[in-house]
Amino acid sequence: MIPSKEEALEELRIAEEMNPGPWAKHSLNVGIAARNIAEKIEGMDADKAFIFGVLHDIGRRVGIVDIPTHVYAGYEYCMQKGWDEVARICMTHSYLLMKDEFTYDPETEHEKRIKEYVSSIEADDYDKLIQLCDALAVDYGFVILEKRLLM
């Protein structure tokens, strides 16, 4: 289950009030990029892609935290809301190589749970789309991948 576009935008607004920062505009731009790309791909739902993009970083609502903490906080929040598909995106968006990201033994409980989760699934088209759009989008718009990945 996923929220409506309106619910997703309201969740982002609330989260930005809780933890102001450029991440919220970045998230909106991820949603816009995901929607625009999904519109051109047969079988993809552009509205779903937009919602996934808008909410991929919703775990940042808890404050300025490291990647595993915001990933897991987003997953937990979305699961509590009953948004299992969005929760999946929260877990997968920061791990482009999925299980191969973990060339080390995770130390924190968050990292252990993330590793277990991403190791148990294969990235689908929405996971890959949000990973791509996460790299393209910044708070002020979009950049070429080379610039974003080298920043």
Residue ranges and their predicted role:
Residues 1-3:
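Non-catalytic interface/linker regions that flank or bridge core catalytic/transmembrane domains
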Residues 21, 36, 60-62:
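Short, contiguous strand/loop micro-motifs
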Residues 6, 33, 37:
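Active-site hotspot residues in diverse enzymes, especially metal/ion-binding acidic/histidine motifs
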Residues 5-20:
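Generic N-terminal amphipathic, Lys/Arg-enriched alpha-helix
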